[in-house]
Amino acid sequence: MKNTFSRLFGFGDKESEFELQDESHEEIDKKVYEEIQEIPIVNITPNRYQPRTVFDDARIEELALTIRTHGLIQPIVVRQYEDDKYEIIAGERRFRAATKLGWEKVPAIIKNLNDTETASVALIENLQREELTAIEEAVAYQKLIELHNLTQEALAQRLGKGQSTIANKLRLLKLPEEIKSALLEKSITERHARALIPLKNEELQLKVLQEIVEKQLNVKQTEERIAKLLEEAKPKRKAKQKAVSRDTRIAMNTIRQSLQMVADSGLNVNSEEEEFDEYYQITIQIPKKK
């Protein structure tokens, strides 16, 4: 984590985009100084910048059993924000496992970091573990972009990822809350969610989401369903009408006006117009007797 932190914040790299400003090397060295202490669990709070919103209870239980057998090999990382109050920077799963074991204290490395640094380290630490859901990962990318005023391309370079990877994840954040919740709960996959993006219409997106869950549609079936909906939504093309010459329009209007005059005189005139490729046909019926 130290290498990641150094790379992101410019420690030892003056050219880094993330270099901390107006700090001496002594101040930087002080920040990364590690001090391990046994801290009461009741004095520790989760990281407010934690991108992970879903913790697998079964995996926490497995981790707790491992810690019970082998001990906590890697201490959690915290920062002090008040007297005897600490916030987790990294290691919330280990913290939860220790709590489950009933420990009163937990070994912790104390770092002196500000809010921006704490958020960045927490986000990067979780991103590198590759255990986040697609939505949690997207939220982490968005927070890093906002914290450091980065473009998607710049963030991709810093994280060693493709720009398209970042862009595809961020698009998920535009989906309705119900779909994002389904992703978090793993009711649908990331590919299902991405397939819903072209629909645009939220009502349609939620309708297809319901179909995916209820009918257990795979990604291919989902894409086919969405393609059909998009096709149905396209405006129907009107049959191309052939251009009608001005003289023809005048002739047709003259006939219609004449028929109206006859009808106005009291005669019951019936007429029917038909259009063919090469001509118009008007059939007129005038009764012999009034």
Swiss-Prot record:
GO biological process: chromosome segregation; division septum assembly; positive regulation of sporulation resulting in formation of a cellular spore
Keywords: Cell cycle, Cell division, Cytoplasm, DNA-binding, Septation
One Pfam family per UniProt: ParBc
Residues in the DNA-binding region annotation: 153-172
A GO CC term attached to the entry: chromosome
Molecular functions per Gene Ontology: DNA binding
Places the protein is found: Cytoplasm, Nucleoid
InterPro entries from the UniProt entry: Chromosome_partition/occlusion (IPR050336), HTH_ParB/Spo0J (IPR041468), Nucleoid_occlusion_protein (IPR023705), ParB/RepB/Spo0J (IPR004437), ParB/Sulfiredoxin_dom (IPR003115), ParB/Sulfiredoxin_sf (IPR036086)
SUPFAM superfamilies referenced in this protein's UniProt entry, alphabetically: ParB/Sulfiredoxin
Principal cellular location given in the protein's record: cytoplasm
Function of the molecule: Effects nucleoid occlusion by binding relatively nonspecifically to DNA and preventing the assembly of the division machinery in the vicinity of the nucleoid, especially under conditions that disturb the cell cycle. It helps to coordinate cell division and chromosome segregation by preventing the formation of the Z ring through the nucleoid, which would cause chromosome breakage.
Family: Belongs to the ParB family.
Protein name: Nucleoid occlusion protein
Organism whose genome encodes this protein: Bacillus cereus (strain 03BB102)
Lineage, highest ranks first: Bacteria, Bacillati, Bacillota, Bacilli, Bacillales
Encoding gene (name): noc
